[in-house]
Amino acid sequence: MAPVTPPVKPAPVFDTIYFDGNKTHINPIGAKSLDRNGLILKENPHLKVVIEGHTDSMGSDVVNQKISEKRAQNVKKYLQDKFNISDDRMMVKGYGRTRPIADNNTKEGRAKNRRVEFRIVP
């Protein structure tokens, strides 16, 4: 008889955190999403993530790069402060406006591009 393999637990799905234009602070809607992400990290202590910051295309490359990095850093700090997630489990990376997921020619598209995403790493 063949051995029974236990079911594989699917990888958790993290919420995307959205930001207001040209802002780096976490708004109340973003905080609710971050709280869900914090619980995922708390319940899965083996997980490590890269916190990836992004911007829309408004403004200069230099400014957008700084904004994307600051957004990612603020998300990391929030998770450290509120959920006591250790520093070695979270890396931050800013991509500026180089990785849009929507059309930057529309207000709606720009709003989708102002975000922080979580990527699980080994």
Question: What do the predicted segments below correspond to?
Answer:
Residues M1-K48, D81, I85-D88, P122:
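Periplasmic peptidoglycan-binding/tethering modules of Gram-negative envelope proteins
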